């Protein structure tokens, strides 16, 4: 380990120092200020005898008299099963006044995407307890399914609800042994306010969800540079629990927009040529390095499933952050401002939402035999009702047919009964599908052209008058 006092420039979160030896990319650095404070950093660039160092705690207090020590290793996360139930800062240090963490091993936080040949296709259902997700845009183990929201929307409450309620259904008889069925949540918060952090922690502690969770907290007043480390700490912990301890791990990352803003800040400090809207040209690659760490590996019981949450600036889904995220991930869940203004909780708009892996994770033996048909029919009926709402504004409801009016009623009830369940209600997939059939039974049988006749006969609810006629005939 060699020590230098050769700082030449300080720019934003970056420190530049001259060196006379080869320094590795991502190497960990300690900087000791004149006041005796020790700060941690990481090498971003090394060329022609000068290295650029990003300082996690910020560059305040650093001057040209500060000492720079290169430790000769990359940043590692100390991992152990005992991390469950702990709260850490964005750099992986405990902040919950708990006992010192004794790691079983230390793993490089950079990690690597899973070898495509070794990947196992995601096919098993994860129950979030949220009908708009479980019923219409099902999440499966090993998937990466982002939530697209905008500033001021209740995505934090939705994140807490999923973290609190998410579970892996019991294996079917004859399925895998139960050792691989343990479930854990790794929650990574980046750039959130102290108020949001308090809400998260109160909810975790009130509901007991903290016992099966690891929480990483990077606050808004923490250094932006730390935000580039937090998701890698989160995913390294998730990979350890999934692939070495056989947990099914759900990773929730919020807010990825703050992460990308940190990338832009560092890029500006390095005077890089900017890409779209000032973001670095390598942002797509950087995001892919994070998102592609989700998945399953052949021969391993565990899995890593990701739900990254991002706020779309200006509610614009063509903004570089949601746009690039959409290219990499397998669908999206939309939090809709209009539905939120109507008081729906959670305000998920199912029409633009999509889970590309849903069809492989539902059906007999996974959720229920009629799930796919119910989902398709509800999508079609709700879309028809939405179109008719626009028409009603022009011609009035009296000009519509009886069937059209039923579609309008279906759309209203779909939002009020299916989507609007509140942030504290946990619905099983059975309850979700039963509510779906209650709604579809508002429509005549001959309108259910996307559902198999066998399922209609088994699940369709006759109205009261029809039941009375049948009972009288009996």
From Swiss-Prot:
Q: Which GO terms describe its molecular function?
A: ATP binding; proton-transporting ATP synthase activity, rotational mechanism
Q: Which domain of life is it from?
A: Archaea
Q: Give the membrane topology.
A: Peripheral membrane protein
What InterPro entries does its record include? ATP-synt_VA_C, ATPase_a/bsu_AS, ATPase_F1/V1/A1_a/bsu_N, ATPase_F1/V1/A1_a/bsu_nucl-bd, P-loop_NTPase, V-ATPase_su_B/beta
> Any S-S bridges, and between which cysteines?
none
The protein's matches in PROSITE patterns, at most eight in alphabetical order, are given as: ATPASE_ALPHA_BETA (PS00152)
GO biological process terms on file? proton motive force-driven plasma membrane ATP synthesis
What cellular component GO annotations does this protein have? plasma membrane
Subcellular location per the Swiss-Prot or TrEMBL entry: Cell membrane
What keywords sit in the KW lines?
Answer: ATP synthesis, Cell membrane, Hydrogen ion transport, Ion transport, Membrane, Transport
Q: Where does the secretion signal sit in this chain?
A: none
Q: Which Pfam families match?
A: ATP-synt_ab, ATP-synt_ab_N, ATP-synt_VA_C
Keyword Membrane listed? The answer is yes
Quaternary structure note: Has multiple subunits with at least A(3), B(3), C, D, E, F, H, I and proteolipid K(x).
User: Record's PANTHER family?
Assistant: V-TYPE PROTON ATPASE SUBUNIT B
Query: What is this protein's function?
Result: Component of the A-type ATP synthase that produces ATP from ADP in the presence of a proton gradient across the membrane. The B chain is a regulatory subunit.
Q: Which family does it belong to?
A: Belongs to the ATPase alpha/beta chains family.
Report the protein name in the record. Answer: A-type ATP synthase subunit B
What is the organism field in this record?
Halorubrum lacusprofundi (strain ATCC 49239 / DSM 5036 / JCM 8891 / ACAM 34)
């Amino acid at each position: 380990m060699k020590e230098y006092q050769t700082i030449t420039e300080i720019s934003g979160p970056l420190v530049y120092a001259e060196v006379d030896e080869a320094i590795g990319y991502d190497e960990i650095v300690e900087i000791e200020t004149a006041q005796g404070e020790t700060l941690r950093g990481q090498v971003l660039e090394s060329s022609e005898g000068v290295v650029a160092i990003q300082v996690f705690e910020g560059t305040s207090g650093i001057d040209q008299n500060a000492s720079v020590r290169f430790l000769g290793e990359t940043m590692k996360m100390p991992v152990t099963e005992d991390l469950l139930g702990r709260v850490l800062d964005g750099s992986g240090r405990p902040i919950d006044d708990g006992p010192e963490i004794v790691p079983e091993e230390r793993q490089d936080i950079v990690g690597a995407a899973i070898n495509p040949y070794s990947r196992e296709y995601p096919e098993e259902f994860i129950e979030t307890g949220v009908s708009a997700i479980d019923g219409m845009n099902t999440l499966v183990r090993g998937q990466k399914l982002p939530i697209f929201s905008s500033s001021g929307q209740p995505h934090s409450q939705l994140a807490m609800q999923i973290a609190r309620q998410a579970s892996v259904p019991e294996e079917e008889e004859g399925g895998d042994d139960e050792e691989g069925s343990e479930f854990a949540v790794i929650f990574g918060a980046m750039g959130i306010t102290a108020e949001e952090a308090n809400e998260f922690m109160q909810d975790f502690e009130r509901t007991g969800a903290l016992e099966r969770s690891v929480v990483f907290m990077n606050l808004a007043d923490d250094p932006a540079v730390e935000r580039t480390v937090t998701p890698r700490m989160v995913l390294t912990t998730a990979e350890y629990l999934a692939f070495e301890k056989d947990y099914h791990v759900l990773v929730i990352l919020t807010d990825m927009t703050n992460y990308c803003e940190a990338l832009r800040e560092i890029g500006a400090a390095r005077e890089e040529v900017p890409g779209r809207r000032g973001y670095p040209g390598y942002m797509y690659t950087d995001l892919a390095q994070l998102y592609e760490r989700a998945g399953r590996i052949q021969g391993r019981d565990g899995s890593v499933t990701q739900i990254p949450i991002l706020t779309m600036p200006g509610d614009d889904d063509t903004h570089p952050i949601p746009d690039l995220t959409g290219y990499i991930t397998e669908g999206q869940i939309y939090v809709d401002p209009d539905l939120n203004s109507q008081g729906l909780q959670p305000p998920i708009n199912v029409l633009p939402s999509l889970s590309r892996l849903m069809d492989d994770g539902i059906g007999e033996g996974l959720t229920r035999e009629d799930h796919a048909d119910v989902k398709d029919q509800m999508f079609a009926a709700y879309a028809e009702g939405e179109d008719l709402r626009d028409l009603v504004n022009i011609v009035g409801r009296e000009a519509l047919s009886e069937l059209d009016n039923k579609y309008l009623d279906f759309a209203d009830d779909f939002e009020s009964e299916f989507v609007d369940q509140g942030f504290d209600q946990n619905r099983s997939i059975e309850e979700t599908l039963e509510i779906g059939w209650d709604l579809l039974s508002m429509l005549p049988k001959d309108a259910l052209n996307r559902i198999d006749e066998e399922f209609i006969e088994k699940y369709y609810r006759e109205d009261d008058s029809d039941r009375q006629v049948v009972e009288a005939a009996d």
